[in-house]
Amino acid sequence: MTYQNSSKPPFRADHVGSLLRPTLLHEAREKFALGDMTSNDLRQIEDKCISEVIKKQEAAGMKAITDGEFRRASWHYDFLCSLEGIEQTAPPQGPAFKMGHQINSLSISSKITNPGGVMLDHFRFLKETTKATPKFCIPAPSLAYHRGGRDLIDGTVYPDIEEFWFDLCAAYQDEIAYLSDAGCDYLQLDDTTFAMLCDPKIRDQMTERGDDPNQLIKTYAKGIANAVSAKPTDMTVTVHMCRGNFKSSWIAEGGYEAVAENMFSNLSVDGFFMEWDTDRAGGFEPLRYAPRDKIIVLGLVSTKLPHLETKDDLKRRIDDAAKYIPLENLCLSPQCGFASMAVGNNLSEDDQWRKLALVAETSEEVWG
């Protein structure tokens, strides 16, 4: 394929989405939580901080601009729990971050519906505020199932699991239609499940609860396909996958070999954001399964550590990846967001901007 850098995303220099929240926003949220600030005042501060972070992304050389997810506490709970029928619940025994933090699950206690564009106002402000390409990120539908499985889906509400998937994907179709009507043509679905299923321990946990890990890949891919089935042809949809990202910690370990052939053959999107910042992600060999009409965005720059990678190392790793898929099919980005949760990772805002500038500069030198 011929891939042009200038106009259509994903871009040669791209990024995942979430950014470190500034002190002003953290303080405002604390005041709001204590009842010392109104929702209108909080909104004004969010608007101010988002406007500033948009300018900084543009100055760093990014062509895809996000709102940093500054209105969210979490990359996934805020969206999913805004859908009718889905709520957070105590974590079951299962995957945890390496520093010990246990993650909440999601339970389904009533029919899933979309109450009417749950993040539409987020996108509208983003689009109004940037002259570049607004990129919007929402969690993939698989997150509503993966952590709790069938046990956390009320059997009286959904006696047939296919009805659950149908309603869930219909809610996504509604949201994507709202976003498209508002002018969104670059949508990213954040999905940790594919990379989690690279880890033998997590695969064992899925098997123990009654799920077939290989079938889950197909089920999750089908869910994404159904969710985006009505998208307009000019909307680019990518999937970002990672092994966990909270306070610079992670959950899963293991290369993509365990999922690559199954995933690439079943997941029909325009591009894949895949992390390869450490040995936890294995080598680039699984890229031999990647379709030649898709774009692979190499997540080579760590958002977990302040250490700044070098251009030479990034170029060498891009060359290594190009042994398995043409260079024209590759782009560059950080491996994940800098703040998947509002608390953020253990690096500074200056570190963050240096890393994004490095992505832009390296990309320009590699692809022009």
Segments (PLM) and residue ranges:
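Domain-level signal for soluble alpha/beta catalytic cores
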Residues: M1-G368
